[in-house]
């Protein structure tokens, strides 16, 4: 089944697309995950900790293109993380790659279709709070969607979720506290703040950084917000963690680069991996 990744995918089209995706995955694995984990730029090493895993390249799944962003391997994996069945995305799809919002969120919706009820989203982000230097880990307490897009535009799929989705607690308070508890147990410093999602792929100007900070943002990136909207629409609980890879434009006086993002991910990735592994191990069974 071939799809153009630029073709709009309204919510009403998602059930049929998810049927095809689920069938393709089930042809390779019958594992029913409890948790879904999305690994952002430079954070893919957690996938190395999976056991009994099955790896499926994005391009092998119907309608999904290969991931093109550096630091995103572009694989869906099913396996055991410290004895807990999980589904993991080693990389993600972005709108700046030319993908429709409905396609960008399909991986998270597929995680729910496969059985995961808890979704952990990670990303690399720029720091808006001057106190959040490179290497800071931040639990996402709330977000501001400045992409100008939503995955819920168009006829609804009532079988998945409501027409009008409440986002009061988009990031589940109980899961946020569990992340903080896991970080304390691992002696990892973990902050909390507001994530602002932009379209990308350009980094922000210094003037935009000042504006976003004035709006209450603590970190800024090019992902996550649409995935959270779709996950909450599908009745999934969401936790999010940003790795601040660089100060916002204008703070340091240095130009920004994706190489800097990947290097920070390599340095801080092991700390984040320890927190997520403990979080997953200690998550109560449904």
Where are the regions a protein language model picked out?
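His/Asp/Glu-rich mid-to-C-terminal helical/loop segments that flank catalytic regions of hydrolases
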Residues: 249-286
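Generic non-transmembrane alpha-helical segments
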Residues: 24, 28, 174, 178-188, ...
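Glycine-rich tight-turn/loop motif centered on a GG-T
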Residues: 157-168, 214-217, 252-265
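Metabolite-binding pocket within alpha/beta catalytic cores that recognizes anionic/polar moieties
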Residues: 2-167
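Active-site-adjacent substrate-binding region
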Residues: 172-234, 238
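Polyanion-binding loop/helix "lid" in catalytic or ligand-binding cores
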Residues: 160-171, 183, 197, 209, ...
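Zn-dependent metallopeptidase/amidohydrolase metal-coordination segment
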Residues: 222-260
């Amino acid at each position: 089944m071939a799809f153009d990744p630029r073709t709009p995918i309204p919510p009403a089209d998602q059930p049929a697309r998810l049927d095809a995706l689920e069938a393709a995955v089930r042809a390779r694995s019958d594992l029913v995950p409890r948790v879904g984990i999305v690994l952002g730029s430079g954070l893919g090493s957690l996938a190395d900790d999976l056991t009994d895993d099955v790896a499926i390249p994005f391009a092998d799944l119907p309608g999904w293109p290969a991931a093109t962003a550096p630091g995103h391997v572009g694989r869906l994996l099913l396996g055991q993380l410290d004895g807990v069945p999980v589904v993991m995305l080693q990389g993600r799809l972005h709108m700046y790659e030319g993908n429709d919002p409905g396609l960008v969120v399909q991986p998270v919706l597929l995680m729910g279709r496969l059985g995961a009820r808890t979704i952990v989203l990670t990303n690399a982000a720029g720091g808006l709070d001057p106190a959040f230097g490179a290497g800071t880990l931040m639990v996402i307490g709330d977000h501001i969607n400045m992409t100008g897009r939503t995955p819920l535009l168009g006829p609804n799929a009532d079988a998945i979720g409501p027409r009008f989705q409440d986002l009061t607690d988009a990031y589940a308070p109980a899961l946020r506290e569990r992340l903080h508890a896991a970080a304390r147990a691992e002696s990892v410093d973990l902050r909390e703040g507001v994530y602002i999602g932009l379209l990308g792929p350009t980094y922000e100007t210094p003037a935009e950084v000042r504006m976003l900070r004035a709006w209450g943002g603590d970190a800024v990136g090019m992902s996550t917000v649409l995935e959270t909207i779709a996950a909450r629409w599908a009745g999934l609980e969401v936790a999010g963690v940003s790795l601040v890879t660089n100060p916002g434009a204008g703070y340091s006086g240095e130009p920004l680069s994706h190489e800097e993002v990947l290097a920070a991910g390599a340095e801080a990735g092991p700390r984040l991996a320890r927190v997520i592994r403990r979080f997953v191990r200690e998550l109560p069974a449904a």
